[in-house]
């Protein structure tokens, strides 16, 4: 419920949104929900979370990252969920356009959703 709500809020920006924990994609809003929900996250996404920094696609197709193996969409932007000083997951936006660069508003929406989830988990 909490994860689905956060994914829905980000999805209103007309992209596929997801929320994951450190192992699996927990919630997806937008196209690809069935393909992505409950799949194991990719190693690059895991490394992004461990870095504890937001991610923005560089807009070059050969440098795109997948949220899980074989995903039809790539990461546009993502932010780690940091609760109590620990990385508990991430929130992100996905796109089919491998050359897309995220807008500032999209990155901020993802960061706000991640901060919101972190606050909810701490309470």
Where are these regions (language model features)?
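Single conserved hydrophobic/aromatic residue that forms the stacking wall/gate
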Residues: 1-3, 7, 11
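Short N-terminal helix-loop-first-beta-strand/juxtamembrane motif that initiates sensory/input modules
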Residues: 9-25
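Regulatory sensory and allosteric helical modules in signal-transduction proteins
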Residues: 22, 34-68
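Short amphipathic alpha-helical signal-transduction/dimerization elements
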Residues: 53, 111-122
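A short beta-strand signature within small-molecule sensing/ligand-binding domains used
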Residues: 70-80
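Short hydrophobic/glycine-rich mini-motifs in sensory/regulatory modules
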Residues: 81-91
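Regulatory loop-to-helix N-cap segments in sensory/regulatory domains
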Residues: 95-108, 120-123
